[in-house]
C-alpha cells in the first residue's frame, strides 16, 4: 500500500515529477542580464563623472577669465554661456543620481531573485523538516501549490474541487492579476502566461 512506503522515498519520487530547471535557467539569465546592466551602468557613471569633471574645469576656467577680462567680454553672451554650462552640469548630475537609484533598485531585485532561487532549490532537495515531510508526503498537490505560492501565484479551487482561478502577484510592480482558467486551454499555455505576467 502507498502508506507502507517510507515517506522519504515517496517525497523523492514526488520531487522527481517537478522540473525546476527552466526556472533556474531563467533566473540565471536574469542574473547575467543584471550583471551586464550593472557593468553598463558603471561605464555610464564613469563617463558621466568624467564629463562632469570636464565641465567643472571649463566652468572654473571661464569664471577666471571673466574675472580677469570682464571689460573685454560681452556680459550678456558670457552670462548665457554660464547658464548653459550650469544647465549641462545639472543635467549630468541628475543623470548620475538616477543611475545610482536604478542601480540600487536592480541590486534589490537581484537579491530577491537569489532568495527565490534558493527557495526553489530547497523545495527540490531531500532532507526537509520532519513535519513538512509528513504533511506533504500524502498529497503531491500541496507541493505544487507551495511552489506556485513561492512564485507569487495562488491557485483557487471551485466547489467541485477543480482549479479554476489563479491570482498572480507581481511584487516588483505591485500588480495583482486574476486569471479565470478555462479547460480548453492547455497547461503549457497557462504556464507561459503565468511566467510572462510575473516578468511583465
UniProtKB/Swiss-Prot annotation:
CDD domains: RWD_Spc24. It comes from the Eukaryota. One of its GO terms (biological process) is chromosome segregation. GO terms for cellular component: cytoplasm; Ndc80 complex; nucleus; spindle pole body. Signal peptide: none annotated. It holds the Pfam family Spc24. InterPro entries: Ndc80_Spc24, Spc24_Fungi_globular_sf. The keyword Cell division applies. Acts as a component of the essential kinetochore-associated NDC80 complex, which is required for chromosome segregation and spindle checkpoint activity. This is Probable kinetochore protein spc24.
Amino acid at each position: 500500500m502507498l502508506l507502507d512506503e517510507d515517506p522519504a522515498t515517496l517525497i523523492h519520487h514526488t520531487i522527481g515529477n517537478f522540473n525546476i530547471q527552466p526556472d533556474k535557467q531563467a533566473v540565471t539569465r536574469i542574473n547575467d542580464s543584471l550583471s551586464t546592466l550593472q557593468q553598463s551602468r558603471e561605464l555610464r557613471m564613469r563617463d558621466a563623472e568624467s564629463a562632469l569633471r570636464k565641465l567643472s574645469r571649463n566652468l572654473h576656467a571661464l569664471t577666471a577669465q571673466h574675472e580677469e577680462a570682464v571689460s573685454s567680454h560681452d556680459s550678456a553672451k558670457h552670462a548665457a554661456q554660464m547658464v548653459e554650462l550650469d544647465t549641462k552640469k545639472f543635467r549630468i548630475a541628475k543623470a548620475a543620481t538616477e543611475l545610482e537609484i536604478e542601480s540600487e533598485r536592480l541590486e534589490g531585485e537581484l537579491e530577491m531573485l537569489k532568495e527565490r532561487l534558493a527557495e526553489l532549490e530547497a523545495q527540490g532537495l531531500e532532507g526537509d523538516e520532519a513535519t513538512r515531510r509528513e504533511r506533504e508526503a500524502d498529497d503531491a498537490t500541496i507541493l505544487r501549490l507551495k511552489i506556485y505560492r513561492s512564485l507569487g501565484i495562488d491557485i483557487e479551487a471551485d466547489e467541485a474541487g477543480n482549479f479554476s482561478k489563479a491570482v498572480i502577484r507581481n511584487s516588483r510592480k505591485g500588480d495583482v492579476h486574476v486569471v479565470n482558467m478555462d479547460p480548453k486551454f492547455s497547461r503549457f499555455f497557462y504556464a507561459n502566461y503565468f511566467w510572462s505576467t510575473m516578468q511583465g
